[in-house]
């Protein structure tokens, strides 16, 4: 129906609703690239609507156009700020402001742009101060947990250890748990194995307090943190010398990642295959590492199209 409208009615290409709907229709399809033109048009069609400026990036991220993902979401955020000055910060549109900055983090990380990712993460935190989180904690709190993923993506191990656990661990229950995960991974990579094991224990205690009601869009925080646990245990075991055990945990993390409910951006910000591929290379398992990276890049079509990350620098570097 939508494609018929675009084929038969030239005015459809200036209809924001049709363009918006088509992008959402195609983002889970085998051919998201069909909506690239629609996104390009929508980006400039209503320049004062931040969400519509952002919308094309739902397709860009699936097609490996990560520079557009970053630049368009930063532009959308600029528009959002203008609306915030007009309408204030305490309204439903706060979620859209968070979403655009959250998306910008993904674009920056896939590009390998550390400074841009850290900047977007810092700005995202500014959008979710305590008073905002308290309005809808089951939705808003998980945005605060974005920063540790950026630190891990860029191997900022010393900086991770210096991160403070939240004072209000009930309000920031997901963030508290994820920070223990990050610190365990950091210590494992720094060779501080005893500290890593202690953080694993702290993670388990914190994880037990996470309620089923806490979500990151379509996925429960508990499911996302269950994936984090496998990643954490995999890194800790591997760096301790238990390579087989570690790799098996990471393979389980990949399985859990593949079975999370679809959303954009993805609930787990750093593709699990990147860590698995890197440690497989370190272990000399070159054939499996190649297969892991090829799957992540979508070169072998083994993964559903929305689960592929074409042209990302991390998997390309590993494959090279």
Regions found by a protein language model. Give the residues of each.
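Residue at a conserved register position within TPR or TPR-like alpha-solenoid repeats
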Residues: 25-26, 60, 108, 151, ...
């Amino acid at each position: 129906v939508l494609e018929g409208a675009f084929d038969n009615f030239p005015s459809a290409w200036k209809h924001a609703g049709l363009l918006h709907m088509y992008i959402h229709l195609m983002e889970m399809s085998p051919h998201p690239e069909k909506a690239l033109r629609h996104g390009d048009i929508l980006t400039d069609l209503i320049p004062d609507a931040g969400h519509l400026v952002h919308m094309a990036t739902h397709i860009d991220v699936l097609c490996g156009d990560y520079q557009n993902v970053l630049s368009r979401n930063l532009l959308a955020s600029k528009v959002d700020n203008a609306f915030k000055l007009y309408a204030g910060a305490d309204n439903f549109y706060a979620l859209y402001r968070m979403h655009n900055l959250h998306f910008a983090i993904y674009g920056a990380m896939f590009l390998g742009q550390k400074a841009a990712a850290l900047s977007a993460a810092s700005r995202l935190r500014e959008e979710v101060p305590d008073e905002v989180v308290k309005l809808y904690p089951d939705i808003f709190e998980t945005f605060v947990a974005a920063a540790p993923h950026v630190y891990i993506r860029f191997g900022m191990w010393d900086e991770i250890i210096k991160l403070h656990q939240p004072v209000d661990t009930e309000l920031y229950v997901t963030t508290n748990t994820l920070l223990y995960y990050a610190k365990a991974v950091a210590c494992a990579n720094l060779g501080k194995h005893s500290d890593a094991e202690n953080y694993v224990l702290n993670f388990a205690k914190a994880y037990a307090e996470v309620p089923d009601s806490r979500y990151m869009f379509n996925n429960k925080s508990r499911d996302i943190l269950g994936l984090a646990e496998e990643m954490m245990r995999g890194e800790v075991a591997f760096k301790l010398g238990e390579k087989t055990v570690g790799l098996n945990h990471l393979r389980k993390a990949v399985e859990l990642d593949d079975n999370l409910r679809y959303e954009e951006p993805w609930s787990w910000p750093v593709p699990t295959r990147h860590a698995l591929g890197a440690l497989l290379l370190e272990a000399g398992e070159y054939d499996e590492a190649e297969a892991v990276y090829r799957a992540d890049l979508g070169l072998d079509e083994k993964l559903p199209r929305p689960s592929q990350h074409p042209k990302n620098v991390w998997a390309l570097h590993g494959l090279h």
